[in-house]
Amino acid sequence: GIIATIVISLMKSFGVKIESRLVWDTAHRLFGFYSLLALFLALMLLSLLLGRKETLLGYRDILKESGQGNPDYLKKYGDFPTIFNMGVNGLAMTLILYFLGGDFNGPTIGSIFCLVGFSATGKHLRNILPVIFGVILAGTLKVWSVQDPSSTLTLILVTTLAPIAGEFGIFWGIIAGFLHSSVALNVGILYNGTNLYNNGFAGGVVAIFLVPIILAIKDRQKPMAIYDEEAKKLAIKDKLFDKQEVKLPKNIFWK
């Protein structure tokens, strides 16, 4: 994103004009939906049949991950739990896109496969749903619709911010998704849409802005929590002393 911004800025300075165009298929929506539905259901069923209990136990552990640091689910939990997680995430995104009226074409299917691929290293249902909901919420309040081509891609690729939801909770995940929807739809102006990874760049901008704010708020909350804990300890000690339950160890002054 930074490189594209610099290059496009230089080109504009020399009078070079870059025209953008939109190629967006809307005629094969049902075919794309049913194809993805069959694929992801097959992934889930095969992993359950072959892995059985191991699959479910591993998937349960995957859901406990925050997603930070690109954890390798294949190494930590094995093949079947990871494949099951990929199927679950792909199925969830496919259903969400379908019921929101989104299109299934090259860009959207490719974006869903991107989500599925990264489901082997960090993403799972618990940390992607909050950021997705943030984009859906934004679509009901802002001037654009989730069915718009650029908004549809943002809805899928906002999962780049899944670690924020995994680490800091559902509330901050929704906020991250809400902010990302605006940044991703406007940051492309900097490089005239020439950056393929527009949502990745926008996600980085949102993370750089939001994470320090979250940490600052949490740091301010820590002293109060520590104070409350110390106050509880002192109250317990005073209560024990009043009841004369505090006993000195024997032979502390003499043998």
Predicted region positions:
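Signature of multi-pass transmembrane helix bundles
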Residues: 1-90, 94-99, 145, 168, ...
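Transmembrane helix-bundle signature of multi-pass membrane transporters/permeases
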Residues: 2, 91, 115-119, 136, ...
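A short glycine-/small-residue-rich loop at the edge of a beta-strand within enzyme catalytic domains
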Residues: 83, 128, 152
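Conserved mixed alpha/beta catalytic, RNA-binding, or beta-rich assembly cores of soluble enzyme
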Residues: 96-147, 156
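Alpha-helix N-cap/helix-initiation motif
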Residues: 126, 150, 194-195
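Short helix-perturbing small/polar motifs within transmembrane alpha-helices
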Residues: 141-144, 154-170
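Alpha-helical transmembrane segments of multi-pass membrane proteins
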Residues: 151-157, 171-178, 182
